[in-house]
Amino acid sequence: MANDKKKMVEAITAQEVDFAQWYTDICTKAELVEYSSVKGFVVLRPYGYAIWENIQKNLDARFKATGHENVAMPVLIPESLLKKEGELVNGFAPEVAWVTAGGSDPLEERLAVRPTSETMFCDHFSHVLHSYRDLPMLYNQWCSVVRWEKSTRPFLRTREFWWQEGHTIHETAEEAKAETEQQLNCYADFAEHDLCIPVVKGRKTDKEKFAGAEATYTIEAMMKYGKALQSGTSHYFGDKFSRAYDVTFTGRDNTLQYPFQTSWGASTRLIGAIIMTHGDDDGLILPPAIAPIQVVIVPVAAHKPGVLDKCRELAAEIGQYARVKLDDSDKQPGWKFAQWEMKGVPVRLEVGPRDIENGQCVLVRRDTREKQFVKFEELATAIPAAMEALAKDLYDRALQNRENRTYSATTMDEVKQLAKEHTGFIKTMWCGDLACEEAMKADAGLSSRCMPFAQEHLSDVCPVCGKPAQKMVVWGVAY
């Protein structure tokens, strides 16, 4: 049995040997993605897409609970429309893919394959918004977008990726700002409760904010070995896009006004976050809330009378409260154990003839590998309890890892020394000047992750220039 497991997992590079290769191995060996014949594009395989479907389902329920509606915008954007908002087009220009012909006929105007959909939403709003009575308009779209990245990695940075993008317009700036905050909190709640990933909430610096936004807010997660991953963003646009695209409405005082706008998005990058936060050298460890299979039943000595029948009976019962799979394939149990561990299934049940005689089975948690004997009649409480405990432990381990890898500095020498010796979050004060932010990158290799909402007073001055500090910033090395 041990040899079967070794054969199954030996192709996975150990995390401590080469974390980047380990990540790639997990993506392919766990059958999440397959590289396509188009460079930078991947195929989301059924298991990978099933994870994304659960992310979609759980997020979508949250969006609809706050009044948002799903829509679908065209995938192509006329160049003239994209150019109406200068900051946006300048921000995305290097990454835009263009359609220049339809069949064999050249197009009169180039069409951009959407890198994001602000322009199409604004164009739509300009046609359907008339009165303050139409507001707010709370829209969300599930789709893929294309950005011509130079360096790609599955889930983290691909030329096409799947995401949701919310776009809303409001009568007042206060309502739009409240929407921006609400959606950021939605992402944070989802990341921490469903994905078991602790996040830092904060505001991006002007250098790091979304092109064209007045303010960008973010949730930043720390991966296992200390690198940062931006895991969801929420943007407040003010009325800048409304003015650029002539989106107006008749206000309560019968004057023509511009609505205030937001956008917010999260993507399949979240799957990368799950892999790098929770995975181990044997594969994925999936949080139960988004696991395609929450419980796998593995028959032991399946050829013995009654074993498969009992497993089928258990699968039917468990299926009433959990996503369950009975692996009745002809592979050896040891191979199955290794396969489902690689795929990160939270709970495994082992059922053999002796177990059936004793009215029990073996329950194994994916994260601890600890085995416990559970009476069949107690599974309905034992399985949910095991999944709840696993989710809590995943979160607690990730939080402990973040705390262990978070440092504070008050001088540039301290920053450089910490950055040289450790990978993690470094907290410092900051004067607010772009030059000092760029010096952090040039001298210490760190980018600003955010100005956390939970501010601390570490010192009175900026460590770069010595001028009075305005905010505490979290710095790090990001994917």
Residue ranges and their predicted role:
Residues 1-479:
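NTP/phosphate- and nucleic-acid-binding module
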